């Protein structure tokens, strides 16, 4: 379900960075696009969001999440919980296949369609087919280097792209 995507985010203090690869795969064997933008700025540039899953579903969720951010004046946690409620309860939304990582300078959350809103304990989150590789790399880098979040996510994505066939090295990094 979550092939052709890796998203990783790191929060250190009031700095946060998120990175995603650019590969879009159709089916199991055909790369359709190399430079897709899977990480975006939302809510006047104050929130980062990245998705893994169906592109059409992700656009729907980005739009709904941004509406929730507007409704709750940029309160990331409240917007995330309300999106997760809608996602779980609404018949049309329930069928969407995607995961989101959202972050602002205060917090980072992983949002799933089954209603989970999870804040990572260590300020590091990753999703998608290369997510476990990126997560392991980011944790090792945070523990053993003094790199800033933007450098950390870049390096973690490079590790993931060297291992996961559904993740390419066309990496987009956003930071707050």
Curated annotation (Swiss-Prot):
Relay the activity regulation note: Allosterically activated by HslU binding.
Where along this sequence does the record place binding of Na(+)?
161, 164, 167
Q: Name one Pfam family in it.
A: Proteasome
Where it mainly occurs, coarsely classed, is cytoplasm
| Keyword Cytoplasm among record annotations | yes
Which compartments does it reside in? Answer: Cytoplasm
Question: What's an example GO BP annotation here?
Answer: proteolysis involved in protein catabolic process
Catalysed reaction(s) here are: ATP-dependent cleavage of peptide bonds with broad specificity
> Where do the TM regions start and end?
none
Top-level class of the enzyme under EC nomenclature = hydrolase
State a single Gene Ontology molecular function: metal ion binding
Does the record bear Isomerase in its keywords? Answer: no
Question: What is the active site of this protein?
Answer: 5
Specify the superkingdom. Bacteria
Write down the EC number: 3.4.25.2
Q: What functional role does this protein have? A: Protease subunit of a proteasome-like degradation complex believed to be a general protein degrading machinery.
**Subunit structure of this chain's protein:** A double ring-shaped homohexamer of HslV is capped on each side by a ring-shaped HslU homohexamer. The assembly of the HslU/HslV complex is dependent on binding of ATP.
Mind telling me what this protein is named?
ATP-dependent protease subunit HslV
Q: Taxonomy-wise, where does this protein's organism fall, top ranks first?
A: Bacteria, Bacillati, Bacillota, Clostridia, Eubacteriales
Q: Which gene encodes it?
A: hslV
